[in-house]
Amino acid sequence: MVFVKGQKKATKGSTQSGEEKTASTTPKVTKTPTEGGEKKRKKRKSDYTSFSTYIHKLLKQITPPTNAKSNEKGDRKFTISSKAMSVMNSFVHDIFDRIATEASGLAKKKKRQTLHSRDIQVAVRIILTGELAKHAILQGMTAVNKYNPTESKN
């Protein structure tokens, strides 16, 4: 759209010809008051996924065995600060994003629109190296086998 000197830009409230809108095309939804007279608001689900619960579960798993000599009070638990949790959360998001991007690139090279478990496995081998990749692939394969067990043939 080209504007000539002296011509006004179209705004949200007006049309291009300069006419004013009189009524909205969609009706407004009114909220019904609750018993206390307050309006009930819906909770919006956040778009951000947090892995903090899973990180806490991992911390419980790696707690060292209790030794009577070193620890007189009993169970010793690891804790994590909120900043460290934020770092771990962004780390997990970054790794998932890299794996998804690499796997989608592999599927596009094969001219497929569906991601297969093999694509994810190859992407993990590319992104993670060495022993970490071996453990990640092994854990992934056990999860896939647990989710989708092969049927016994009779």
Swiss-Prot record:
* InterPro entries per UniProt: Histone-fold (IPR009072), Histone_H2A/H2B/H3 (IPR007125), Histone_H2B (IPR000558)
SUPFAM superfamilies found in the cross-reference section: Histone-fold
Q: Which UniProt keywords apply?
A: Chromosome, DNA-binding, Nucleosome core, Nucleus
**Which cellular component, as a GO term, is one annotated location?**
nucleosome
Basic residues: bias regions: 1-11
Q: Where is the composition biased (Polar residues)?
A: 12-27
Places the protein is found: Nucleus; Chromosome
Task: Outline what the protein does.
Answer: Core component of nucleosome which plays a central role in DNA double strand break (DSB) repair. Nucleosomes wrap and compact DNA into chromatin, limiting DNA accessibility to the cellular machineries which require DNA as a template. Histones thereby play a central role in transcription regulation, DNA repair, DNA replication and chromosomal stability. DNA accessibility is regulated via a complex set of post-translational modifications of histones, also called histone code, and nucleosome remodeling.
Q: How does it assemble?
A: The nucleosome is a histone octamer containing two molecules each of H2A, H2B, H3 and H4 assembled in one H3-H4 heterotetramer and two H2A-H2B heterodimers. The octamer wraps approximately 147 bp of DNA.
The entry's family comment says:
Belongs to the histone H2B family.
Q: What is this protein called?
A: Histone H2B.v3
